């Protein structure tokens, strides 16, 4: 049985779902605050310095919020990463003593999201993307956002065993659409 994997990388929340050949779609459980589970994960990263020189500890989703609260805000909390893709004014940021390009921030979040899923996702996925990125006021802004997403899908693929990722405009990237089209 083959299955399609879909990742909704959202500005505020993200989710992962699978659809099997029979059309059954399942949102996968992700860790929630307090040890529970949820079907959506906050699209948020938290960076803090580790005990060893140069060590950087990175948390994502619910764990990022918990670490931020536990540390008294001593690290760097980064949210709404996707909302900066179209902006020429934001190309990256500093956190825990080093610079991270926006592509690295997104790839880091996607690796953490994939690692939080307790199911083998296989090696292929469809990643939803907006028809128009937030803040894209010109064709150049939209192109910038799209250019910044190209490396982020390849990079997580090479570091998380996803060998075949494709981007699809929403709502075509939603689970029912995956099983009715020949994406693979």
Feature-to-residue mapping (PLM):
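Phosphate-binding loop and its immediate beta->loop->alpha context
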Residues: 23-150
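A short acidic Gly-Thr/Ser loop motif
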Residues: 7-13, 130, 177-184
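Short helix-loop-beta junction
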Residues: 149-158
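Conserved phosphate-binding catalytic cores of ATP/NTP-utilizing and phosphoryl-transfer enzymes
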Residues: 1-3, 157-184
């Amino acid at each position: 049985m083959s299955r399609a994997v879909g990742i909704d990388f959202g500005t505020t929340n993200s989710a992962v779902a699978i659809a099997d050949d029979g059309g059954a779609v399942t949102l996968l459980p992700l860790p929630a605050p307090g040890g529970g589970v949820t079907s959506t994960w906050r699209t948020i990263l938290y960076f803090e310095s580790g005990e060893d020189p140069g060590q950087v500890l990175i948390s994502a989703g619910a764990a990022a919020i918990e670490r931020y609260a536990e540390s008294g805000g001593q690290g760097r909390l980064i949210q709404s990463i996707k909302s900066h893709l179209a902006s020429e004014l934001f190309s990256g940021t500093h956190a825990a003593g080093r610079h991270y390009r926006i592509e690295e921030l997104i790839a880091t979040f996607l690796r953490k999201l994939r690692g939080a899923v307790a199911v083998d996702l296989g090696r292929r996925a469809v990643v939803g993307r907006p028809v128009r990125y937030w803040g894209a006021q010109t064709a150049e802004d939209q192109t910038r956002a799209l250019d910044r997403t190209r490396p982020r899908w390849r990079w997580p693929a090479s570091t998380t065993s996803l060998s075949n990722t494709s981007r699809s405009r929403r709502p075509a990237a939603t689970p029912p659409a995956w099983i009715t089209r020949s994406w693979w």
